[in-house]
């Protein structure tokens, strides 16, 4: 009896261990996240493009697992004032969406302040403020394309920028368009760079956008018009975009911290950012 037991006991122990491991791997663990207090969320950009619709969007923050559009903040008094003496009271176009007049564009060198007066207080506050300067930008920018056949499944086209950078620290954000359709329509897709490597010099075709030829919306055909908008932004807004991109990018759960709200420039604990920037455009026809 003892001999038989000794012969098979390792296999029995192995099956028992595998069973325990399998059971532990399939165990359901429910994670409970406490809801925090509600805060005001602000999204507002003023640009030097008079053809753009300029809005200030106000919403309320929601819990981590909230799977619906955030509640809009309605019936607020929202105004934008410039230190050049300009003052604009915005109209509410849609719930939570406050519109600047058609044809508005921000002016280089002007500092703009945003004033928000809520109908009902949020997080104990009814008034919120923010401000932003409007950085200058050069006079001319040019666009180029370079094909990289070894990148990805079907290659990439690199959108290149040729530009004389003004002397001194500058920060730029780039949006890419194909036939007037914005391809970089989320903050995670925008290219934001500083001028560390070309301060006061020529950019000589730096990559500011990447078109994946295995993606239907990015495939280039003869006659397509490729454009970019170069925006001269503040250092604060550049850091904000970089931090948002870090938060939404892939990370290893075991070694990364929990998601957190990115610090903006609004007063009294509000989330988001209000900014103003100048812009240049460049376009080319793909052949």
What label would you give each PLM region?
Residues 3-13:
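Bacterial N-terminal signal peptides that target proteins for export
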Residues 21-24:
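C-terminal motif of bacterial Sec signal peptides marking the signal peptidase cleavage site
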Residues 26-287:
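A sequence/structural signal for flexible, mid-protein segments enriched
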């Amino acid at each position: 009896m003892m001999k038989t037991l000794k012969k098979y006991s390792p296999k029995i122990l192995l099956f028992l261990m595998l069973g325990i491991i399998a059971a532990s791997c399939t165990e359901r663990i429910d994670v409970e996240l406490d809801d925090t207090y509600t805060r005001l969320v602000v999204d507002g950009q003023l640009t030097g493009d008079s053809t753009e619709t300029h809005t200030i969007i106000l919403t309320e923050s929601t819990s981590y697992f909230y799977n619906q559009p955030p509640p809009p903040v309605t019936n607020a008094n929202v105004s934008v004032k410039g230190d050049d003496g300009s003052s604009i009271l915005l109209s509410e176009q849609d719930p939570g969406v406050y519109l600047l007049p058609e044809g508005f564009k921000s002016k280089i060198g002007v500092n703009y302040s945003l004033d928000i007066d809520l109908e009902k207080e949020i997080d104990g506050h009814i008034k919120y403020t923010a401000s932003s300067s409007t950085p200058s930008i050069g006079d001319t920018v040019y666009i180029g394309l370079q094909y990289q056949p070894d990148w990805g499944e079907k290659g990439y086209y690199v959108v290149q920028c040729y530009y004389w950078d003004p002397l001194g620290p500058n920060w730029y954000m780039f949006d890419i368009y194909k036939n007037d359709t914005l391809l970089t329509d989320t903050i995670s897709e925008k290219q934001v760079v500083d001028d560390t490597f070309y301060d006061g010099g020529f950019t000589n075709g730096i990559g500011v956008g990447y078109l994946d030829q295995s993606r239907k919306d990015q495939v280039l055909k003869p006659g397509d018009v490729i454009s970019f908008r170069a925006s001269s932004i503040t250092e604060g807004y550049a850091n904000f975009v970089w931090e948002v991109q870090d938060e939404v990018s892939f990370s290893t759960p075991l070694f990364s911290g929990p998601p957190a709200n990115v610090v903006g420039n609004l007063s009294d604990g509000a989330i988001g950012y209000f900014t103003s920037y100048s812009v240049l455009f460049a376009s080319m026809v793909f052949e």
